[in-house]
Amino acid sequence: MRIIISPAKKMVENIEALPVCGEPSFIDQTNQLLTYLKSLSYEEAKEIWNCNDQLATMNFERIASMNLKTKLTPAILSYQGIQYQYMAPEVLEKDQLEYIQEHLYILSGFYGILKPLDGVTAYRLEMQAKVNLSDKKDLYEFWGSLLYNKLREETDFILNLASKEYSKCIERYVTEDVRLVTCVFGERKGEKVIEKGTYAKMARGEMVRYMAEHKISTMSEVKKFDRLDFSYDENLSNETKLVFLKGESNVRDRK
């Protein structure tokens, strides 16, 4: 089993908490992207980043002096979004870190795909960014099937905890010999299941922590996730989707 998750926009430098253990698999492609970003004017870069002037200025200056070899942070500690707060990797036990290092991958517009302890530097480049590099219209074309093929080399079962923006770069290439299962964390609204961004991010991070704590390796174990008031709903799930509903475990228990 391999687990895929999204990165976060906010990143920090933390070179002391954990040692870096490995280089990103596609560092050559990352160097290409860095060269491309350095060739852009401020206005061109700001358009790609789709952000305000304060963030654009910070990232433009960051790109100008960026070095992919020094002052690196383990990827899992570099990202600072809600998902990572609930995963709380900085307090994982040694055996739990070993679990995520073996099973978890972070998808990235800049690095492609990362193991938790791969060394990274802070950047801003979302997977949906419109780049024009090597005749590719966007990063989905730039990365192509590379990221999926990396996963396929290691597993025939991918658990998708990533957002649509990022899982899209894997889903479009899935072959019959690999099973990809997506976790949905939502609430029932009439006949529909609605995913709320904040709750979904919280649950994805909590799921990674849950899996690391219990060394989960099977689908049946994943279904037992019951944190943050979520519980598995068998009726809404199928072979490619595991649905976890918020606030319904007590309702089912009373039936």
From Swiss-Prot:
Entry's family note: Belongs to the UPF0246 family.
Signal peptide location: none
GO cellular component term of the entry, any: cytosol
Protein name as it appears in the record: UPF0246 protein Cphy_1568
Record Pfam families: H2O2_YaaD (PF03883)
InterPro entries documented for this protein: YaaA (IPR005583)
Gene Ontology biological process: response to hydroperoxide
